[in-house]
Regions:
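Short coil/turn linking the two alpha-helices of tandem helical-hairpin repeats
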Residues: 148-149, 153-155, 207, 229-235
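Aromatic-residue-lined binding/catalytic grooves and analogous aromatic/hydrophobic interfacial grooves
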Residues: 217, 222-250
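Conserved, well-structured interaction surfaces
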Residues: 83-151, 183-186, 198-207
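Inward-facing hydrophobic residues that define packing positions of alpha-helical scaffold repeats
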Residues: 108-111, 189, 196, 238, ...
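Sec-dependent bacterial lipoprotein signal peptides
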Residues: 1-18
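Conserved small/polar residues in nucleotide/adenosyl-binding loops
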Residues: 251-257
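Membrane-proximal, proline-rich intrinsically disordered regions
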Residues: 20-68, 245
């Protein structure tokens, strides 16, 4: 028994030196996707699009903060400081931004990959791929709208449409535009509305998966909200808000039997 124990210990000790080599310690890029070869069909495009949705789910964005921040920034709610979250802040951000800035731009980068794909050369249902790119346009608009609300200066000292907005990024890692300048709030609103209108024209309800994904009706609803919000800086947008709201279909909603409209 003692001899068996010694042999077991010896072989276990020996395995420390022979079990792995230098090659096993080197990381691989097996999970990376080459943008030139990684998107080959409709399903690949959907897979990339899903990663944009995934980047919107952390607690720092739509997983929590984005949903409650409107109330937290007012007198409606306050933090009891028990968790250390949402305590007083001087808003002393670094030049590179803080808060949801980086999270949102990472999601925008994924949308730009989808939008930049040449779907004519991909295999699969062209209608489905057009719908996916439409989702990317609408989602890119929503993401920039969230940035504009957080970082735009259009409500600072009556700055209006000519005040600083945020960089509106439409390409993925463009070498000539890696550090884009901030556009005006008015230009941001124009780009946001343009992306939403493009997305609406490209999406098809036949390809809707669930309410967890962007749809044409969802884009109309966001367009109405964007135009209503932007009307404070450009009153001509109120007409767009009305038109978009009237385009949203409510036929799938069922009112309680004792209610009336």
């Amino acid at each position: 028994m003692k001899k068996l124990f010694k042999l077991t210990f010896f072989f276990s000790f020996l395995m420390l030196f022979v079990a792995c080599g230098d090659d096993d310690l080197e990381p691989t890029l097996a999970q990376d996707k080459d943008l030139n070869t990684g998107i080959n069909n409709a399903d690949d495009l959907v897979s990339v699009m899903n990663s944009a949705y995934d980047r919107m789910t952390p607690s720092g964005y739509y997983g929590r903060n984005q949903v409650i921040m409107g109330d937290v920034r007012t007198d409606n709610l306050y933090s009891n400081v028990n968790s250390g979250r949402f305590t007083d802040s001087d808003m002393d951000y670094s030049p590179n931004g803080a808060g949801p800035w980086s999270t949102i731009y990472r999601a925008i980068a994924i949308c730009n990959i989808v939008i930049g794909a040449d779907i004519a050369g991909l295999e699969g249902d062209q209608g489905k791929m057009s719908h996916t790119q439409g989702q990317a346009h609408a989602l890119r608009a929503l993401l920039h709208f969230d940035l504009l609300q957080d970082y735009g200066q259009h409500f600072v000292n009556g700055g209006g449409a000519g005040a600083l907005g945020v960089p509106y990024v439409k390409t993925y890692k463009d070498p000539a535009n890696l550090s884009p300048a901030r556009d005006t709030a008015g230009a941001n609103l124009g780009d946001i509305i343009g992306d939403l209108q493009t997305g609406i024209s490209m999406m098809n309800d036949a390809y809707n998966i669930s309410t967890s994904y962007m749809t044409k009706m969802g884009a109309y609803a966001i367009l109405a909200r964007v135009a209503l919000y932007g009307g404070a800086a450009d009153s001509s947008l109120y007409a767009t808000a009305t038109s978009a709201a009237e385009s949203v279909s409510y036929t799938h909603l069922t009112l309680p039997t004792n209610s009336s409209v």
